[in-house]
Amino acid sequence: KDGYLVGNDGCKYSCFTRPGTYCANECSRVKGKDGYCYAWMACYCYSMPNWVKTWNRATNRCGR
């Protein structure tokens, strides 16, 4: 599946101040095929296994 990686706090992985390879590395860590820093704000990953938690507007709990 594709989507934004989320941490234990339910927030998207921020990449604003990270090196250019940060998101690709984080995505491969969870067995994703590739990833990038979307609009310099959050890591978006491709071809991840279904067990990986991704951000969803309906179930968003970041900051709550």
Swiss-Prot record:
SS bond list: C11-C62, C15-C37, C23-C43, C27-C45
Pfam family, one: Toxin_3
Subcellular location: Secreted
GO molecular function, one term: toxin activity
Chief location of this protein within or outside the cell: secreted
CDD domains: neurotoxins_LC_scorpion
UniProt record, GO biological process: defense response to bacterium; killing of cells of another organism
InterPro entries: LCN-type_CS_alpha_beta_dom, Scorpion_toxin-like, Scorpion_toxin-like_sf, Scorpion_toxinL, Scorpion_toxinL/defensin
Single GO cellular component term: extracellular region
Domain of life: Eukaryota
Boundaries of every LCN-type CS-alpha/beta domain copy: 1-63
Tissue expression pattern: Expressed by the venom gland.
Keywords: Antibiotic, Antimicrobial, Cytolysis, Disulfide bond, Hemolysis, Ion channel impairing toxin, Neurotoxin, Secreted, Toxin, Voltage-gated sodium channel impairing toxin
Function: Shows antibacterial activity against both Gram-positive bacteria (B.subtilis, M.luteus, E.faecalis) and Gram-negative bacteria (P.aeruginosa, Y.enterocolitica, A.calcoaceticus). Modifies membrane sodium permeability on Y.enterocolitica. Is toxic to mice, but is not to crabs. Induces concentration dependent haemolysis in human erythrocytes. Acts by inhibiting the sodium (Nav) currents.
Family: Belongs to the long (4 C-C) scorpion toxin superfamily. Sodium channel inhibitor family. Beta subfamily.
Domain remarks in the Swiss-Prot or TrEMBL record: Has the structural arrangement of an alpha-helix connected to antiparallel beta-sheets by disulfide bonds (CS-alpha/beta).
Protein name: Bactridin-2
Source species: Tityus discrepans
